[in-house]
Amino acid sequence: MTTALDQLKQYTTVVADTGDFQQLAQYKPQDATTNPSLILKAVQKDAYKPILEKTVRDHRDESADFIIDRLLIAFGTEILKLIPGRVSTEVDARLSFDTPRSIDKGRELIKLYEDAGIGRERILIKLASTWEGIRAAEVLQKEGIKCNMTLLFSLVQAAASAEAGAQLISPFVGRIYDWYKKQAGADWDEAKNGGANDPGVQSVRRIYTYYKTFGYNTEVMGASFRTTSQITELAGCDLLTISPDLLQKLQDSNDTVERKLSPDALHDKPTERVAIDEASFRFQLNDEAMATEKLAEGIRVFAADAVKLEKLIDSLR
């Protein structure tokens, strides 16, 4: 029998969402994604402590920020040895509202990769999908630095990212699901709100349909999954980035996976493009409580994990 994972790969580019690169080979993903939380989690494992310790030792007198950049590149370099495609490396979330510094950081990360002998075509620079992050992506893309817009929870963020020429977006599924489930409390009905009716799945489907309707080349990569059902409901999406735990569940399953998304079979096609000047962007984002709250929370969590990583580095000096 063909596994669910192998069936999914017939329709979608499968990406591994992890800093634990030793798990990559068994799932044979095309690309990989990392974020500050995943790197923090990885360096606390015995298998990866030597990478952290060596990076600190080699740059002991430099700032924690300087060392973190080298640590990100060290992980990215190891990941790229194990996959044929691209790795996503994230700009510090504390720069989410600072366009000039986000641009500078993106350039710095690319230079570090190129100094390590890795071409920029194999790197995606992850930026938060704030107005400022999207403007940074617009500049970087024109310089040939490909960007992955993360912490994306709404159509207006997706529309603005596409207009800016971003290479790829990462609309979050699980965190949207979490928000609606928490809001409903005891009234949540999993049977009614799961599967194709999952609010996170519906959000990605809407974004995918918008992009294909208006001919945007920006890739759609569903992210932040809680269940294999959320993944299989998006079979056919350009890419899906999946944690090792869920990759394993898909590999262990022989359930049939059918294509759910296709540019040739779009439903509920939009008739108008979203207005995305700065004022319209901010108003539409503000008008969507879920997107506003999850974007803010995501930035806080990633920023807090960056601080934890800095403290861990300082403790090793």
UniProtKB/Swiss-Prot annotation:
The active site is at K126. It is found in: Cytoplasm. GO terms for molecular function: transaldolase activity. The keyword Transferase applies. One of its GO terms (cellular component) is cytoplasm. GO terms for biological process: carbohydrate metabolic process; pentose-phosphate shunt. Keywords: Cytoplasm, Pentose shunt, Schiff base, Transferase. InterPro entries: Aldolase_TIM (IPR013785), TAL/FSA (IPR001585), Transaldolase_1 (IPR004730), Transaldolase_AS (IPR018225). Its main location: cytoplasm. Transaldolase is important for the balance of metabolites in the pentose-phosphate pathway. This is Transaldolase. It comes from Burkholderia ambifaria (strain ATCC BAA-244 / DSM 16087 / CCUG 44356 / LMG 19182 / AMMD) (Burkholderia cepacia (strain AMMD)). The gene is tal.
